[in-house]
Each structure stands twice: as structure tokens, then as C-alpha cells.
């Protein structure tokens, strides 16, 4: 029974059309008829969102064409038609890119190869270590934790102590009880991870490790299973995390992300705090706490 449930949520090539169908249905159900400028007759709609024929009308295509697309049929919209459908559904930039990925995987375009292993070049390791007072880490494909500096490991978790296959941010967030305790707003952080992972999965639909990761999380976490089924996609490039650290107490850290040249699937995360705040004091305390260990390793 468990394997059957996991298969329902695993991102396989055979399920690409279903992924497209589910995404379009969800986007249509969230549409706002008034925002779309559709006339209303004063009657309450039986179901929320837009009707198929309304999306087709707004996009300038036939109802039959849009219906076949929403059913996941293997048809290839032109860029103009795809843009019209995205506008009709009022998709944001990330959702548009996700739709493009899903449409692309249903066509006969050459498949994109996914390297089996991502590596961080030595200069980036040096950069991480140079950021002594700021936590920093590099995430790769499917949110794998490729590298982190000592302060990031002290703030979040000692990722280097995990087996290589377990060094994954989403996996840690959902399956490690300490992560649930660390994030004051765990639900928001976990939802964001699901949305980022779904966007990444659409970009590499044939990646075996991504498929295995999604399957494992779907079988192990009811929260992941529920949020994955919502088909929401987003990539947060900055924000704030509120933490309840077991050593230094509560603090808030802001983060910014940078996509690294040479590998668009590698992202540098740098965490900062406002100066002269209790959060900065907490981070400074953590720096002093790990300093002896860092010094001894250097010697």
C-alpha cells in the first residue's frame, strides 16, 4: 500500500502528462473571474476558479484545444499560444517557467542530460570559509547540500556528519526532528522547500535521484505528500528565517541567494543579521562557540 501511494507522487517521465494536467487544473481553479474581466450574472459558481471555456476564450484558442492540453495530451503549443494561456491563468514568472518546463517534457525535443555528481570548485570552498561571521552554504540540484561553512553547520545542522546521499536540504527539513524544532515557522519553510523542489524537478524530469527523493519524502511525510499534490511552484531568492537555536536561543536571519557561474543548478545562500540586534549578538555568540574547533582543525 505504501509503495502504491509513493508512486502517485513520484515524478516519472510516464507521469509528465499527468503533471501538466494537474498543474493546469490547479491554476484554473485559482483563477479570479472578476480579475480576468469576465462578466458575472450574479449567480454563485458551483466550483471556484475559471471554467475551461473561459480560459480558452481569454487565451484565444478553442475550448477543445485547451481541454486536450489540460488533459495532458501530447500537443505542442506555439510560444505565442503558451504565453496567452499563461496570461489567461494569471501565472507569475516562476509558474510560467514551470509551465514551459512541463510543456517541454511532453515534446520530442532532445533530452537534457543530468550529470550524476555535482562538485563545488575549490575557490568556492575558500569563499565559504572566508565568511567567518556569516553562515553560508551552496545548494545544488534537487536542493542537495554541496558545501557549507562552519557557522552554517553550527546554526542549522552538521551536514558534513551525514552520509553523502542524506545531505539534502528538503530531506533534512522534513525528516529530521531537530529541523522541526529549529524553525519557529516550520510550515512556511517546509512549504517553500516543496515549491522549490517541484520547480527543480520539472527542469530535470528524468533525474533518478530527484525521483527517489520525492518518492521517499512522499512516503515518509504526510505534510510533504499534501503540499506536493498542490502543484505550487516558487523560487525564493531572499527572505527571513526565524530560528529557535538550542544554544543561542531565538534569532532571525535574512538570506540572499546567488546563482553561481558555470553551473546554474548551484546556488549560494548567505545569511545575515541586522547589526546591533539581539540576533547579531546570538550569531556572534555562536561564532565564539565554534571558534576553538575551527582553530584546532586549521592547526
PLM feature segments, named:
Residues 18, 22-58:
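Short basic helix-loop element that most often maps to the first helix and adjoining turn
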Residues 41-46, 52-53, 59-76, 84-86:
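Recognition helix of helix-turn-helix/homeodomain-like DNA-binding domains
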Residues 35-49, 109-123, 129-130:
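An N-terminal domain-cap segment
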Residues 122-299:
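Hydrophobic protein-protein interaction segments
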Residues 25-32, 100, 104, 129, ...:
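Amphipathic, well-packed alpha-helical segments that form the structural scaffold of globular domains
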Residues 25, 29, 57, 87, ...:
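Short polybasic/polar patches that bind polyanions
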Residues 3-10, 14-25, 77-83, 87-119:
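Short amphipathic recognition helices of helix-turn-helix/homeodomain-type DNA-binding modules
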Amino acid at each position: 500500500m505504501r509503495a502504491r501511494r509513493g508512486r502517485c507522487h513520484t515524478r516519472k517521465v510516464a507521469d509528465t502528462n499527468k503533471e501538466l494536467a494537474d498543474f493546469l487544473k490547479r491554476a484554473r481553479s485559482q483563477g479570479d473571474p472578476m480579475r480576468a474581466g469576465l462578466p458575472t450574472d450574479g449567480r454563485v459558481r458551483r466550483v471556484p476558479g475559471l471554467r475551461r471555456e473561459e480560459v480558452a476564450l481569454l487565451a484565444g484558442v478553442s475550448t477543445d484545444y485547451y481541454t486536450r492540453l489540460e488533459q495532458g495530451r501530447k500537443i505542442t503549443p506555439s510560444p505565442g499560444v503558451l504565453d496567452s494561456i499563461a496570461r489567461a491563468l494569471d501565472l507569475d514568472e516562476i509558474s510560467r517557467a514551470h509551465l514551459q518546463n512541463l510543456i517541454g517534457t511532453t515534446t520530442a525535443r532532445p533530452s537534457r542530460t543530468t550529470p550524476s555528481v555535482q562538485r563545488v570548485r575549490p575557490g568556492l570552498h575558500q569563499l565559504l570559509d572566508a565568511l567567518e561571521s556569516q553562515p553560508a552554504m551552496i545548494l545544488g540540484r534537487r536542493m542537495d547540500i554541496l558545501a557549507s561553512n562552519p557557522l552554517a553547520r553550527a546554526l542549522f545542522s552538521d551536514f558534513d556528519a551525514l552520509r553523502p546521499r542524506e545531505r539534502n536540504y528538503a530531506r533534512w527539513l522534513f525528516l529530521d526532528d531537530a529541523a522541526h524544532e529549529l524553525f519557529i515557522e516550520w510550515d512556511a519553510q517546509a512549504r517553500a522547500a516543496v515549491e522549490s523542489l517541484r520547480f527543480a524537478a520539472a527542469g530535470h524530469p528524468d533525474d533518478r535521484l530527484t525521483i527517489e527523493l520525492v518518492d521517499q519524502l512522499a512516503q515518509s511525510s504526510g505534510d510533504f505528500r499534501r503540499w506536493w499534490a498542490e502543484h505550487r511552484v516558487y523560487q525564493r531568492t531572499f527572505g527571513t528565517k526565524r530560528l529557535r537555536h538550542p544554544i543561542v536561543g531565538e534569532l532571525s536571519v535574512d538570506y540572499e541567494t546567488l546563482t553561481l557561474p558555470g553551473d546554474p543548478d548551484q546556488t549560494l545562500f548567505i545569511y545575515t543579521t541586522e547589526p546591533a540586534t539581539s540576533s547579531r549578538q546570538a550569531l556572534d555568540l555562536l561564532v565564539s562557540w565554534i571558534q576553538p574547533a575551527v582553530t584546532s582543525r586549521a592547526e
